[in-house]
Amino acid sequence: MGWPWAPLTAVWALGVMGATALRIGAFNVQSFGDNKVSDPDCGSVIAQILAGYDIALVQEVRDPDLSAVSLLMEQINRVSKHEYGFVSSKPLGRDQYKEMYLFVYRKDVASVVSTYQYPDPEDAFSREPFVVKFSVPSCATKELVLIPLHAAPHQAVAEIDALYDVYLDVIDKWNTDDMLFLGDFNADCKYVKAHDWPSIRLRSSEVFKWLIPDSADTTVGNSDCAYDRIVVSGAHLRRSLKPHSASVHNFQEEFDLDQTQALAISDHFPVEVTFKTH
């Protein structure tokens, strides 16, 4: 296809901020599998985007044998001067359609301390969170817990609310409240309306700080919806936030793509936040 982004590999893919800041992102890479990662145009851009983060959540991973993930990791490690590793959930879903949560992380910055699959006793989630505790020695908290969610669109209100139960479960299990909830919550437009927010505990409780505003547009297409979100809890982690760093990463502009080219990669933009390190 001869896309025009080739010269833009430079700074973003090198992850140069990693020594002075911790950048975390969440990216719903629509229907990520062998076809997408092996497409030289799509695979290269996805790898470059992910190599810009110290820790990144990838959603809509449909790759039970990890063949696409293995190729993705090769591509990330080829474009970055740093070595990346990954940890993933099992395929999740109530019916034949299943997705995996995938975290990729820069090995010299972060390491996996522990993981667990939220047991979901009330069957609140279509794809229950795969909870990961990372060690990040350069961060003030030293450890932080990442809780991913790709919410089923028409159950988004109930699923976002149920993240409060995951919050309590993590506190009970690991005795920490330094958590980052992130992913495609489908938290806007026809799935979550203004009158729904008061009933969502993750939103109504002052324990949580929502970093991506309702006014954001995290979609690549013509819609204007803040589907993808990042929510932080824990006094230590909140104090470590780099002010005004939470944002939507518009890779269409970054790589100078037209909308058709961008939509071939995903119908979502990544969302991201940066934490101060020492």
UniProtKB/Swiss-Prot annotation:
GO terms for molecular function: DNA nuclease activity; endonuclease activity; metal ion binding. Residues 1-21 form the signal peptide. One of its GO terms (cellular component) is extracellular region. Disulfide bonds join C189-C225. Its EC number is 3.1.21.-. Keywords: Calcium, Cytoplasm, Disulfide bond, Endonuclease, Hydrolase, Magnesium, Metal-binding, Nuclease, Secreted, Signal. Its cofactor is Mg(2+); Ca(2+). The keyword Metal-binding applies. Transmembrane segments: none annotated. Gene3D superfamilies: Endonuclease/exonuclease/phosphatase (3.60.10.10). GO terms for biological process: corneocyte development; DNA catabolic process; hair follicle development. It is found in: Cytoplasm; Secreted. The active site is at E99, H150. InterPro entries: Deoxyribonuclease-1_AS (IPR018057), DNase_I (IPR016202), DNASE_I_2 (IPR033125), Endo/exonu/phosph_ase_sf (IPR036691), Endo/exonuclease/phosphatase (IPR005135). Divalent cation-dependent acid DNA endonuclease involved in the breakdown of the nucleus during corneocyte formation of epidermal keratinocytes. May play an immune role by eliminating harmful DNA released into the extracellular environment by damaged epidermal cells. Belongs to the DNase I family. This is Deoxyribonuclease-1-like 2. It comes from Mus musculus (Mouse).
